[in-house]
Amino acid sequence: MGEDQKNHLKAYGVAFWLLDKQQSEVLWLLNYQGGSFMSAYSSKLETECKTRGVSYSVISETAANQIESEIANPSVNMNMVKLLNAPKIAVYSPKTKQPWDDAVTMVLSYAEIPYTVIFDDEVLNGKLPQFDWLHLHHEDFTGQYGKFWASFSTAPWYVDQVNETESMARKHGFKSGRELKRAVVLKIREFCMGGGFLFAMCSATDTYDIALAAQNTDVCERMFDGDGISPSAQQDLEYQHCFAFKNFTLERSPYAYEFSDIDVDPTRRNVSEETDLFTLFDYSAKWDLIPAILCQNHTRTVRGFMGQTTAFHKDLIKSDILVMGENALLNEARYIHGEIGKGTFTFYGGHDPEDYQHHVGEPPTDLNLHPNSPGFRLILNNILFPSAQKSKQKT
C-alpha cells in the first residue's frame, strides 16, 4: 500500500471481500509499506486482485514470518491488527436524488463495498442497531435545510426537500423538520452510546453537534420552521451534549451560508488551492492504535478540499478529542476522533477530497481518475475500523 500500489482504494474493497465473502482472516500491517494488508494465499484472492487492478505480492511463509518479526520489533513504529469480520454499513441519505455527490457512497461503490441507504424512517423505527457503522454526509440536522433558502428557495430540488421533510415530520408526529431532525440526532446518539461507529463529513459534522446543543431551544428562523428563532437561542445552547465542539457561536442570519463559527470562514483562510494542505499526525501504532489505524496512508500530507463545512476552528474543539489531521498555520483541524459511550465518532471536514470546491449541480467525481487518493483513503480507514481487533489507547 505504498507509492507503488496501482489502486489503493480498491485494495480496501479486496480486504472487505475477504472478510465478507471468503470469511478469511485479514491482517492489517499498520505503517508497513503504507499500511498493507496480508492474507493467506488462494487462487480466488489472486484473481480478485487482478480483476480489480490491485497490486499484490505472493510471498512465502518464511517471508511472512519475517514481516511479522519486523513489525513486532519494539523499536519500529508498526503493528499488526487482525480484521475480524465485515462491518454492516449504513449511509444516512434521502432516497431521492440530491444535486451534489457524496464522497463516501462514491468511494464505497468504487471499492465495491456494499452498504445500505437509510433515512429518517429507518432511524426513528429503530433500525440503527442492525448496523455497525453509520455515515452522515451533506446533511443539516439543525432544521434549516442546509441554509440554501437565500440562494435556492425556488429551486425544484429545494422545494422537494422541504416538502419531503415536512411530510416525514408529520408522519412521525412532529410539527416541523427541526423537531424531526432533533429526534433523529438523539437516535443516532443512542446508536453511538451503545457501541456504534459514526463517521460524518461536511455539514453533518457541525450541524450534528449544534442540534445536540440546541435540543431544548429553537435556532431556526420563521422560513425554516414556521416560527421565529428563540431570542435566547445562543444563551440556551447546552454544549455538554455535544460530541466534539464547545463554546461556539451560532450564525443566526438565514442569508449566511454558515451555521456557526465552528467552520473556518473560506474568505478569511488566506490559502490557495495549491497551498491548501493538512498534515496527518504520526501516531504510535503500538500504543495509540486507534488513531494509527484511522491515519494509515501512503503520505502524511493531504490536499485540502472545501465544503459547506471545510475545517474546524481548533479553539472550539473539546480537550478530550483527538485531532488527527490539521493545518497548524491556520489553527484549523480537518480530521478528528472521539469516544462517546461505548462507541466512537470521526468527523472529517470538507465535501469531496478530489473536487476542491464542489458546487451544487456539478457532476460527481470520477474515481477512476483518482485510484490512489490519500483523502479518500481516510474514509476507507474508517470503513474497516470497526473490524479491527483493538485495545484501548495508552497515551
Cite the ranges covered by each PLM segment.
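Catalytic beta-strand/loop cores that center a nucleophilic Ser/Cys/Thr
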Residues: 102, 109, 206, 236-360
